[in-house]
UniProtKB/Swiss-Prot annotation:
GO terms for biological process: translation. It comes from Deinococcus radiodurans (strain ATCC 13939 / DSM 20539 / JCM 16871 / CCUG 27074 / LMG 4051 / NBRC 15346 / NCIMB 9279 / VKM B-1422 / R1). Keywords: Ribonucleoprotein, Ribosomal protein, RNA-binding, rRNA-binding. PROSITE patterns: RIBOSOMAL_L15. It holds the Pfam family Ribosomal_L27A. Belongs to the universal ribosomal protein uL15 family. Part of the 50S ribosomal subunit. Contacts proteins L4, L21 and L35. This is Large ribosomal subunit protein uL15.
Length: 156
């Protein structure tokens, strides 16, 4: 027996029903009946449609709010102290699995102590963290913030 000899057991596979393809069963209306919403293409009610009454989501009161504040991925000084590298950027922190979410900015916090010189490239840092890193002989590199005044001066 070879691969090309293999065939499914008779009766185990059913042919697909081809509807709307000439007389002989499911021709004109293709099994949808006559007229009405369910006979039209793209027809169907929404998942939460309740026959015209107010949807459950509309009956329940609004609650809470969407916080517009920035949520940071936090990196602590104590975490950097135990690692071998001397330069840390987003890629390095992701490799060490200190930063998990790629869409959030990274912030360095002064939790714990650092006793060696490191260079840290982050989006934000607390004043105490910057002070601690610089006291150990390292530096914290933050992105330059562009203001409208800077843009106006460059245009001149």
């Amino acid at each position: 027996m070879k691969l090309h000899d293999l065939k499914p057991t008779p009766g185990s596979r059913k042919d697909r029903k081809r509807v709307g393809r000439g007389p002989g069963g499911t021709d004109k209306t293709a099994g949808r009946g006559h007229k009405g919403q369910k006979s039209r293409s793209g027809a169907g009610k929404g998942a939460f449609f309740e026959g015209g009454r107010s949807r459950l989501i509309a009956r329940l009161p609004k609650r809470g709010f969407n916080n517009v504040g920035t949520t940071y991925e936090v990196v602590k000084l104590s975490q950097l102290q135990d690692l071998e590298d001397t330069t840390f950027d987003r890629d390095t922190l992701e490799a060490y699995r200190l930063v998990r979410r790629k869409n959030r900015p990274v912030k360095l916090l002064a939790s714990g102590e650092i006793s060696r010189a490191v260079t840290v490239h982050v989006d934000a840092a607390s004043a105490a963290a910057i002070k601690a890193v610089e006291a150990a002989g390292g530096r914290v590199v933050l992105p330059e913030v562009q203001t409208q005044q800077d843009d106006a001066q460059k245009a001149e």
